[in-house]
Each structure stands twice: as structure tokens, then as C-alpha cells.
Amino acid sequence: MERLNAAMAPAPVRPVKVLQFGEGNFLRAFVDYMIDIANEKSDFNGSVALVKPIQMGTLFPAFKEQDYRYTVMLRGLVDGQAVEQTRVVTSVADAVDAYADYAHYADYAKLPSLRFIVSNTTEAGIVLDETDEFSLCPPKSYPGKLTKFLFERAEAFDYAQDKGLIILPVELIDDNGIMLKKCVKALAKQWALGEKFEQWLETACVFTSTLVDRIVTGYPRGEDQAIWEKLGYQDNLLDTAEPFGLWVIESPRDLSDELPLPQCGLPVIYTDNQKPYKQRKVRILNGAHTSFVPAAFQCGYDIVLDAMNDPMISTSMQKTLYDEVIPTLSLPKADLMAFAEAVTGRFRNPFIKHALLSICLNSVSKWRARCMPSLLGYVEKTGELPAHLTFSLASLMSLYRGGKLTGDGRLECQRDGQPYYLQDDAAVLNFFAETSSESPEEQTKEFLSNEAFFGAELCKVPGLVESVGASLREILDKGMRTVMNEKFGV
């Protein structure tokens, strides 16, 4: 079978406008995919040059063998209907190894058409490394690479204001652009690059903070041959993802003319405040996971899709969102309802096998960040406890209860006589290992009194200790499914 190539998917030569640190599945099915659509539907007329952000491993040979073409396949549910959309992406024009060919990489700093820098270097990528050195080609860290690249660009264009760059980090950390800018400014001072450069960073460059949301499942191992047959060509860079996508870009400047993604029908929001959108994602999408997964696992399920096909569990999850979470959020209700509806469809995606136990990683800190604000907001607004969020605390506790510490820092628990293993902060695992012989009521009071776990004394929320303790006792006495049927059965 013929390999995907430029003859199969011809495209005009476009100027490189985007330098992208990272060539992984997410960026290819998200940013590069959107730029490809912008090239088709607007006058953006730009291409992407990929930069390998670390020394190890690369997909670059595969890119070159396919003339920088690859296929994105979006699969999932849209408005309750199964969809499968394929697109050959032609927006990538080059792939540069900054370690093996630094001169080629550095030439991009002198390219007049360059306007954007995109990065996905993982959460650990945006960290200040004070041992990094300007003399390295390239510097070790991503902030180091970016600082040196921007300095060389400023020097090449004599600090022209119109040759600054727009920085678009998509790393999954809060205020990623603010954090990246702090690192760059710190290195500029440490490396004594001068006040002129520091001023150019402030006036000519734009550091945006972004929020991204799309589940990218990557290369479909085990399905690739069948998909190639359907496509009619071989694609070793095939990338799969869900149809849902969201890119919220917080910027001090209006970027919609230079990067006209919303005008192309793409799910991109430009704003001067991304926090309400972050809150929506954390409270609804992530909060739904964290609130229902412990109970679903204890009902005998192993993946999200199977749990969502249980009417009792899916109805309970939806009531959590619509009745208890959404009333505590500030965005327009219609936006929140639509987002919650999309979340339900995403959880039912038949192409995604999301293991419940993987979601249970660090459940206590996740509950604090994702569910506790909704619970406290609901109590403040109504003066009552939210039934489903309150029960989620009891189901979380019962997931951990009775566990024994293993030698490798996990908690071994039992479900129907079979072991399962939980990973969490050592203090959390020690707490449950040491208190599981206590009565449910005593353990609950101690758990909810632990400010280190919650950053607050949840035991002072009226009725919370009593309600969680009573539910925990019921779960231990009757089993999760029986108790959920009694409380929330449909």
C-alpha cells in the first residue's frame, strides 16, 4: 500500500508563521489541525515548523518520509450520534532538530514571516532552571531555548516592534503564559541580556495563557491496518482524537485578525480572562470524573463507558452536574448546560477506553480541587448539603477504606475478593491504612477535620460529618450498588 505523500495531498508552499516546540499527538490533532483549517477557510496562509524540545526520540523521519503530511481522525459522539471525520493535515512544512542542526533551528529566529510560538513541553517544561546556560546550543530547558531564541530574533531585527512574537503555551498548568514569561524574564536578567531586550519582551512580544481541552488517543494500534484500508493509503503518523475541542486564549491584545481561528468555525475563544472557562472545565468535566468514578468502580465497572451505560450511575452523575455544580458557576447558564451535555457525550465515546482506576490517582487532592468548591458554593447558596457531592465523599472514603500499604508506596484494597491498588500522597495512604479499623463515623470526623487534606475544616460544614459518616456506614454494610439504588435509583 502506498504511503501518504505530497502527491496524494498537494498544498501550496506557505510561509512559516508558527514555530512549534513539540511534535506529539496532542499538538498535531489540535493546533496543527486548526491551522490547517484556517489555511483552507481564511487568509491566514501560514505553515508550522516543528522543533524537537528534548534530545531523546523523534518522529521526524516519519514526517519527512510522508512529506510532512498526516491524517487526523476525529471519532466520537456529536449530539448523541456517532461520527467519524478524517482530514489530511498539510500545515506542517518543516521539522527541526535543534540539537543535531542548531544552525537550521537558529535561522528561524531571523525569519521575517515568523509570528507565533506554540509549545507543549509537559507541566515540567515550564520551570526555571537556574543552571541553564546561554552559551549552550540550544540551552537545556524550554524557557532557556525560548529566551535565547527571542534574544537572537531581537538582535537580528534591531529590536523592531513588529518582529516580536506571540507565545501560545498549551502546557497543562495554571496561567501557563504568565509562568513562562516569568521564567524568560528571570533568565534574561541572569544572562545579562540587557534592558533593551527586557523592554522589547514587554512591548513587542505577547505571552498568552491558554486552556486546552481535547482527548487525543493518538496512533490507533491494533486498528491501523483496517483504517489504512478504509483510507486507501498507509499513514504511520495517523492521529486519532475525540470531536470535542476547546482552546481558550487569554491575551492582553486582540489576536483574532492575526490568528482567525474562531472565524473559521473552530472552538477557539479569545478572552481577557480565562478563569471562568478553567473553572467550568475543572468543576464540570473533571469534577464529574472525580465525583462518580469511585462509586462506579465499587459497582463493578472498570472503564468510564461501561459505567455511563448504567442508568443509575449516569443519572446520578448528571444530577450532580445540573443540580449541584452548575448553580455555583458564573458563566451564562446556557453555556454551562451545553458544556455539561457535551461532557456526557464525551464520557459515552465508544472509541475511548478510559480506565476508572487511572482517574482515581490522587483522588483526595482531586476532590479538593474539583468538587469541594462546588459543595461549599452550594451550601453557601442554599444552606443545604448537595446530596450527590456529599455522597461522593463517602464513596471516595469507602474506596480507600480497609487498604494496606505495600512496599512500593501504594494502598492495596479489595473489590469482590480481588486486589486493586491506589496511588496518592503518602499522608493520605497512611491515614487510611491507620484508621480503617475505626468506626465509619470516627474515621469520617477525623478525615474531614484534616486541614492538610482539604485546606479547610470541612468538619465545620453543618451536617457534613454526619451525612458522610452515615453513608459510609451504609456502603460498608450493604454495598455500593444497593445504597446508590436506595438513594438515587432510577
Q: Where are the language model's segments positioned?
A:
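Substrate/ligand-engaging "lid" and interaction regions
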Residues: 1-490
